[in-house]
Swiss-Prot record:
Taxonomic superkingdom: Bacteria
Ligand binding (substrate): 99-102, 121, 245, 317-319, 540
Full protein name: Phosphoribosylformylglycinamidine synthase subunit PurL
GO CC, alphabetical: cytoplasm
Taxonomic classification: Bacteria, Bacillati, Bacillota, Bacilli, Bacillales
Location in the cell: Cytoplasm
Reactions catalysed: N(2)-formyl-N(1)-(5-phospho-beta-D-ribosyl)glycinamide + L-glutamine + ATP + H2O = 2-formamido-N(1)-(5-O-phospho-beta-D-ribosyl)acetamidine + L-glutamate + ADP + phosphate + H(+)
Job description of the protein: Part of the phosphoribosylformylglycinamidine synthase complex involved in the purines biosynthetic pathway. Catalyzes the ATP-dependent conversion of formylglycinamide ribonucleotide (FGAR) and glutamine to yield formylglycinamidine ribonucleotide (FGAM) and glutamate. The FGAM synthase complex is composed of three subunits. PurQ produces an ammonia molecule by converting glutamine to glutamate. PurL transfers the ammonia molecule to FGAR to form FGAM in an ATP-dependent manner.
Entry keyword annotation includes Transmembrane helix: no
Source organism of the structure: Bacillus cereus (strain B4264)
């Protein structure tokens, strides 16, 4: 579309063209007031994309302010490309998680691939080398052909991008529930390492300094991607394929190396990824954060399509692009550096003092807008919140234990539920050993990556049981953070901080906004108690299809520090004769459990409860015992309860089983999902020291029989299961469903 055809300011107002771009009548009036005139077409586009929920968090900011974001190790909290946490020895870990849900629903391969590419850029734009990727995925039930297609393509897209770029995908989670059928969730997390002096910010300081565009050229892909991410999916969403970007991992690999070399140069002033809202957000945010303005000449933007308008160039979300500010007079060095990698680096503007974002094209001024108005002055909405109607009903239910006839058959059925079953089909497609720093590969409680040149490691995980959060958002929010920390501790790490990805339905519905508020309350409380501040994250709203919202899914990405790699602990049994301990009491808690869903086909009632002080005490005891060398294996008890946790520890070992005695009512003892529990094995000679250090109950021992046998307190056998048969069922479940 050429400039001739763009509607003029009067038409934009009278024909309400701004509404098609996502601005409300009130918002358009605010823009008019800020500018003191009617905006032109390009300016309307700038505001519509920067004031979208995706870029401005206008509906979620009041809630996000509840998160604790500071701590003695936090070097950078929310507000930059990614958060940064000190890990000692002048080193720091940089990490962030983001969603790419809407694009993945309509173009799953590219949607997932570019989600990975975008989160990697957020990390290296801080000056860090990306060392690991994780992902948290949600799909409908695998019986559906459409879900199979989405699942296969999303995994292929993640693998395709991560493997080509040479960053290991080391962990994550995949869960399946009917509510995600029309709206899958694809959350990608990247972890990087940095030395303190290399930390860079996305800020445009120094009037007269040069603004440069580096990386891939700009096309028409992804225009209004941020706006598309801020509305519900519908039948017409298929037509929005152009709003899905296309990724090139080989280009990004070169971009990483070039940018990491650039960061060592004193010519660099600021650097930011062109992510959501492309050139608009990177320029407006860099100027606003520095209290400056930016002037840009759009004729100089490298374009891969002809006749692009200023509107299209500013709103394109083409991938693999960065905006940088360099010291005046040093431009040629930058051009030479990028040329070495076969990449473009083009001067396209300068930093100004007047705090305006000013755009020129073909000799004319095409936009003049205050940078702060775009980046900081979006309206903030305090949405009405109303307790969901189902909540009181679920809370009032008397908890019933599901009826189980045959414990062994039930255990086998649980091991084959896709949410519990082995995800080997997924992670076998990922290169998780590239860079050769992966110490604990996918499949244990958390992945561990070596910090090169030290004896330290980084433990990392993503967690969120959205069924619990649906039943009780506040309790479920606490559990999500606690389970992530439990996974880090079981791997020998000290939990440091979290990044979050808040996936919810339409915030304009009061019951959805209530879910958001309550789950953030629960997460915030858990973060404070467990001392894991939130250092950044992402909000993804409008995850609905035909009015049906997904379960509230605030995914937690957590990183922990393994002080010495000899503390690294995994979930599988190590040797026959070791003693098996259970930490934590089991109650008949089945609300939102795998057993409840399997037997009743739906979830209802109260979610499991959690006491965060008890959780903290147990985590500290377990971590200290691991660091003291008293623990052989550690596994958190999660979906499927104790029977599944013990079976998983046996399945991961070779030729080992266990004989265990569990007290209490059999179904609860085996399958309840009470929180703050661990299965730990200990060498016989460490029995006394371990029991002194940790409040735990010895329930049995590891055997060389290749069988798991569980007795009740009367010593009657509840079940005996062959480990090879369990492994076959557990590993075969997902491939079998995909056939």
């Amino acid at each position: 579309m050429s400039l001739m055809l763009e509607p003029n300011p009067t038409q934009i107002k009278e024909e309400r063209i701004y509404a098609e771009m996502g601005l409300t009548d009130e918002e358009f009036a605010m823009v008019e007031k800020i500018l003191g005139r009617l905006p032109n077409y390009t300016e309307t586009g700038l505001f519509s994309v920067m004031w979208s929920e995706h870029c401005s968090y206008k509906n979620s900011k009041p809630v996000l302010r509840k998160f604790p974001t500071t701590g003695e190790r936090v070097l950078q909290g929310p507000g930059e490309g990614a958060g940064i946490v000190d890990i000692g020895d002048n080193q720091a870990v940089v990490f962030k998680m983001e969603s790419h849900n809407h694009p993945s629903a309509i173009e799953p391969y590219q949607g997932a691939a570019t989600g990975v590419g975008g989160i990697i850029r957020d990390v290296f734009s801080m000056g860090a080398r990306p060392v690991a990727l994780l992902n948290s995925l949600r799909f409908g039930e695998l019986q559906s052909p459409r879900v199979k297609y989405l699942f296969e393509e999303v995994v292929a897209g993640i693998a395709g991008y991560g493997n080509c770029i040479g960053i290991p995908t080391v962990g994550g989670e995949v869960q399946f529930d009917p509510c995600y059928e029309g709206n899958p969730l694809v959350n990608a997390m990247c972890v990087g390492l940095i030395n303190h002096e290399d930390i860079k910010k996305g800020q445009a300081h120094g009037a007269g300094n040069t603004v440069m565009y580096v990386g891939a050229s700009t096309g028409r892909d992804g225009i209004h991607g941020a706006t598309f991410a801020s509305e519900e999916l519908s039948e017409s969403s298929e037509a929005k394929r152009p709003a899905v970007q296309v990724g090139d991992p080989f280009m990004e690999k070169l971009l990483i190396e070039a940018c990491l070399e650039l960061i060592q140069s004193d010519a660099l002033v600021g650097i930011q990824d062109m992510g959501a809202a492309g050139l608009t957000s990177s320029s407006a945010e860099m100027a606003s954060k520095a209290g400056m303005g930016i002037e840009m000449y759009l004729d100089d933007v490298p374009q891969r399509e002809t006749g692009m308008t200023p509107y299209e160039m500013m709103l394109s979300e083409s991938q693999e692009r960065m905006l940088i500010v360099v010291k005046k007079g040093r431009e040629q060095e930058i051009v030479d550096l990028f040329e070495k990698y076969g990449l473009a680096a083009v001067t396209m503007g300068k930093v100004t003092e007047d705090k305006m974002l000013r755009l020129f094209h073909k000799g004319e001024k095409v936009a003049e807008v205050p940078a702060d108005a775009l980046a900081e002055e979006a309206p903030i909405y305090h949405k009405p919140s109303k307790e969901a109607a189902y909540f009181a009903e679920f809370q009032a239910m008397k908890m019933e234990t599901p009826k189980v006839e045959n414990y062994k058959e039930t255990l086998f059925a649980l091991l084959q539920q896709p949410t519990i079953a082995s995800k080997e089909w997924v992670y076998d497609q990922y290169d998780y050993q590239v860079r050769t720093s992966t110490v604990v590969t996918p499949g244990s409680d958390a992945a561990v990556v070596r910090v090169r040149g030290t004896e330290k490691g980084l433990a990392m995980t993503t967690d969120c049981n959205s069924r619990y959060i649906y039943l009780d958002p506040e309790m479920g929010g606490k559990i999500a953070v606690a389970e992530a920390a439990r996974n880090i501790v079981c791997s020998g790490g000290e939990p440091l901080a979290i990044t979050d990805c808040l996936n919810f339905g339409n915030p304009e519905k009061p019951e959805i906004f209530w879910q958001i508020e309550k789950s953030v309350d629960g997460m915030s409380e858990a973060c404070r108690t467990l001392q894991t501040p939130v250092i950044g994250g992402n909000v993804s709203m409008y995850n609905e299809r035909s009015g049906e919202a997904v379960y509230p899914t605030p995914t937690v990405g957590m990183v922990g520090l393994v002080h010495d790699l000899k503390h690294v602990t995994t979930q599988e049994f190590k040797q026959a004769g070791d003693l098996v301990y259970v930490i934590g009491e089991t109650k008949a808690e089945f609300g939102g459990s795998e057993l409840q869903k399997m037997i009743h086909g739906k979830i209802f009632g109260q979610s499991p409860s959690i006491d965060l002080d008890v959780e903290l005490k147990r985590q500290k005891q377990v971590l200290e015992a691991i660091q003291a060398g008293l623990v052989q294996s550690a596994h958190d008890v999660a979906e499927g309860g104790l029977a599944v946790a013990i079976s998983e520890s046996a399945i991961g070992a070779k030729g080992l089983g266990a004989t265990v005695k569990l007290d209490g009512e059999a179904t609860a003892a085996l399958f309840a999902e009470s929180q703050s529990r661990f299965v730990i094995t200990v060498k016989r000679e460490n029995k006394e020291a371990f029991e002194k250090a940790v409040e735990a109950i010895q329930v049995g021992e590891v055997t060389s029989t290749n069988e798991v046998t569980i007795h009740n307190e009367e010593n009657e056998v509840l079940l005996t299961a062959n480990v090879d048969e369990m492994r076959k069922a557990w590993k075969g479940a997902i491939p079998c469903l995909l056939k």
